[in-house]
A protein has these predicted regions:
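Nucleotide-sugar donor-binding catalytic core of glycosyltransferases
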Residues: 4-273
Length: 273
């Protein structure tokens, strides 16, 4: 279920390794970035740019920067405090970029603004992290040999951390003998999602592993292993918007469970139903 997505992701984002005697420098600042500079280092954006540039990363508006990545959630003033630099919008929320505030934008919306806009939904970053996680000798999903993700030494603990997921993907267990449906959410302010959960749960119990509609008595720590123990996963977005597709549907595919999805009306453009 997930392997074709992984292959398509690797093939759609080839980064030819260019040999530099000295890679050109790139000063990047981050503003209003969840988790700050350390989280930015884990992102797909940093991974891509680091193949071409020697990056200096900071969060200080008084230091020079070639570009600043951020989003206006919280305070646009932080973005404006960076002077003489190109501002790049990036968001994980259902939010339209303000091109009066930003020079460039990366987001969910299906729009064409020439070289000022790139559609790269949040699920793309999730695919990046999934690709990193399966660079492991025990993972049921395999990376192509020429992938940049194979440049690092592989780990050896995926199966230990995901025994049920590996068994299902490797046809070592019966997928029809799994539980009915799973649900993991942390945001209670999603009335359509909550209403659907109640309706489905009234027909057959849906196991909740997050802080919303929890049925376990604790929040699951390993989401993918949890999802893999059920036939279906209720993976509704918080809100609806054309192009707004987050990591939720990727988590379902990765866990070899069938997604019950609501969110972007155009989701079939991203994933073949």
């Amino acid at each position: 279920m997930f392997q074709p997505l992984l292959d398509a992701f690797i093939e759609s984002a080839p980064i030819k390794k260019t040999i530099f005697k000295s890679p050109p420098p790139l000063k990047i600042a981050v503003a209003n970035w969840w988790g700050g500079a350390e989280e930015f280092k884990k992102s797909a954006l940093y991974f891509i740019l680091s193949q071409r540039y020697k990056i200096t990363l900071h969060q200080n508006p008084d230091k020079p920067a070639d570009i600043v990545f951020g989003n206006p959630l919280g305070s646009a003033r932080k973005i404006l405090s960076y002077k003489n630099t190109k501002r790049v919008f990036y968001t994980g929320e259902n939010e339209v970029p303000n091109f009066n505030l930003f020079d460039y934008a990366i987001g969910f919306d299906e729009l064409d603004f020439r070289d000022r806009y790139l559609r790269m939904p949040l699920y793309y970053d999730r695919l990046h992290h999934k690709a990193e996680s399966v660079n492991d000798t025990t993972a049921p999903y395999k990376l192509k040999d020429n992938s940049l993700y194979t440049l690092k030494k592989p780990t050896h603990h995926f199966k230990e951390n995901h025994p049920n997921l590996c068994a299902v993907v490797n046809n070592e267990s019966d997928p029809l003998k799994r539980g009915f449906a799973s649900f993991v959410a942390s945001n209670p302010n999603a009335p359509i999602r909550n209403a659907f959960y109640e309706a489905l749960n009234s027909i057959e119990p849906v196991t909740g592993g997050g802080s919303v509609r929890n049925t376990l008595g604790y929040n699951v720590k390993n989401k993918n292993e949890f999802l893999s123990q059920y036939k279906f996963n209720l993976c509704f977005e918080n809100t609806q918007g054309y192009g707004y597709v987050t990591e939720k549907i990727i988590d379902a595919y990765f866990s070899h469970t069938i997604p019950i999805y609501w969110g972007s009306p155009s989701v079939a453009k991203d994933f073949n139903p």
